[in-house]
Amino acid sequence: VENIQNFIDLVKVTDNEGVDYYDFTQCNPIPDELHNVHEGSNTIDGVRCDAWYEDDDGLRPMMDMIKDNLIEKYGTYKPIDWQYNNWGTKWGDCETWLMSDTITKDGRECSFHFDSAWGEPFRLLNDIAIKFNLEITNEWFIEMDQGEGKSSYPWTPEDTERIYNEHEEALNQMRETIRSL
């Protein structure tokens, strides 16, 4: 019961209008240094760039020195790459809501509903299960009847290492393929 409460306390967020919502990415939030980074292809003041800042000071290309520093700290300077590396998908959870919260003499069970892009956030869910000592079952559905399934977390330490390594290798291979185009 306490483990679930600790999890809920961390992921329950109140917005500027006083409305509560849930955000699983609070368990492993994107680093502040990557928050205002935009990526793609842009030309700012005649400088072509693939990453830039957009804030109250306007648009500024990201300097190579900053990129190198972020790569050293986080393995990337691109927010989407960080999310894939740490959550297992492009976004963590979106539009998350608590469907049920049941406490019995045997324990506590909560059910959440959330959306995610391009697959379940398997790394995020596995890391949450490990961090909070929870058993998580995720039932997922791909839009337009493209598939469905069920995943259980946490994985064993051996499976966690193997799956994370396979995921990282696949991402690196995909990035290399894109760079070669």
Language model segments and positions:
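Intrinsic low-complexity, intrinsically disordered or marginally ordered coil/linker segments
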Residues: 1-181
